[in-house]
Amino acid sequence: MEKNKLDQLKSMTTIVIDTGDIEAIKEYSPTDATTNPSLILSAVEKPAYKPLMEEAYHYSQKAKSSGEQISLFLDKLFVNVGCEILKLIPGRVSTEVDARLSFDVEGSIQKAQSLIALYKEMGIEKERILIKLASTWEGGLAAKQLEKMGIHCNMTLLFSMPQAIHCAEAQATLISPFVGRILDWYKKHDNVPGYAPAEDPGVKSVTTIYHYFKKFSYKTQIMGASFRNKEEILELAGCDLLTISPHFLQELHDASGNVEQKLDAAKSKQLNIEPIKMNEKAFRLALNDDAMATEKLSEGIRNFAKDAQKLEKMLRTTYKIG
C-alpha cells in the first residue's frame, strides 16, 4: 500500500505539531510540539482546558501581589498545557518566554529558569523542554547563557541569515525560521498572488540557512515554521524538523504521490559557501538593511505580546484578579 505524503515526510524529517490543542496532538502522533501565546489563547477557550486553568489559578494564589499572581498564573498555565502535551508525545514541547522580554537578557533568563522550575515540580526534566525566545540580539545572548546551564532553546521569529548565524553561534538547540510570514511580506511587497514552490521566498530563506549550517557544521537544528500551504512544507522535505499546524498535517495525510527529499546535509557540505562574520554591529546593520526581517520581527514580537496581554486580561476578568 502506498504511503501518504505525511508518512513519507516523517521518514526524512522530524514532524512537530504547531498547536496547543490536545485533541489535535492525539490525532497526528507527532514527535514534538510547539506552543505560543496565540495558540494557548485559542486553546484555553475550550472546556477541556478548564481544569488546567483552575489548577494554575489556585497555584498562583501564593504570589504576593496581583502583578506577580497574574505572571505566575500565566507561567503555570503554559506549563500545565505543556505537561498535558508531553503525556502524548515522545519528544519535547516548546514553551515561550513572554515576548515583552525580547530585549531583556536577564529577564529572559529568569523567566526561562522559572518555567523550567515549574516543569520540574511536575516531574518533567529540562531535556524535554525547549524554551522559545525571540531571535533578537538579546534573545541570542540569553540563549547562550541558558544553553550553558543545560536549558535548551528554540529561537523563534527568525526571518534572516544574520539572526540564524547569531543563534547558531550562541549554540541554541534549534531555530524556527518563519516560512509563511516571509512569503506574506513578499507577496504584499511585490504585489503578486504567489510564487512557484521552489521560488517561494520563505522556502529559499530556509534552504539557504540549512545549507550554511550544514556546510559549517553548526549543531543548531533548523525547524521550518509558519507555513501557508503544503507545497512550502514539501519543498523543505529533509529539513531537520518542520512544525506544522493540524490543518496541513491533515492535508499531507490525505495526499498521495511521491515525496522527494529536497534538503540533504551531505550535499550541503559540498557547496561553495563563504563564512559570514557576525558580531553585534554586523547583526544590527544587516537586520536594519533587511526591511522584511526588521518588519516581521517587530510585528511578531508585538503580536505575541498582544496575545499574552489578551490572555492576562481574560484571566484577570474570569478570576477577578487585581
From Swiss-Prot:
PROSITE patterns in the cross-refs: TRANSALDOLASE_1
GO CC annotation, single: cytoplasm
Pfam families the UniProt entry points to: TAL_FSA (PF00923)
Catalyzed reaction equations: D-sedoheptulose 7-phosphate + D-glyceraldehyde 3-phosphate = D-erythrose 4-phosphate + beta-D-fructose 6-phosphate
Cellular localization per UniProt: Cytoplasm
Alphabetical keyword list: Cytoplasm, Pentose shunt, Schiff base, Transferase
InterPro entries xrefs: Aldolase_TIM (IPR013785), TAL/FSA (IPR001585), Transaldolase_1 (IPR004730), Transaldolase_AS (IPR018225)
Coiled coil: none
Pathway: Carbohydrate degradation; pentose phosphate pathway; D-glyceraldehyde 3-phosphate and beta-D-fructose 6-phosphate from D-ribose 5-phosphate and D-xylulose 5-phosphate (non-oxidative stage): step 2/3
Annotated GO biological process: carbohydrate metabolic process; pentose-phosphate shunt
Entry EC number(s): 2.2.1.2
Active site residues of this protein: 132 (schiff-base intermediate with substrate)
GO MF, one example: transaldolase activity
Family, per entry: Belongs to the transaldolase family. Type 1 subfamily.
Quaternary assembly: Homodimer.
Annotated HAMAP family: Transaldolase_1
Function as written in the Swiss-Prot or TrEMBL entry: Transaldolase is important for the balance of metabolites in the pentose-phosphate pathway.
Name of the protein in question: Transaldolase
Organism: Protochlamydia amoebophila (strain UWE25)
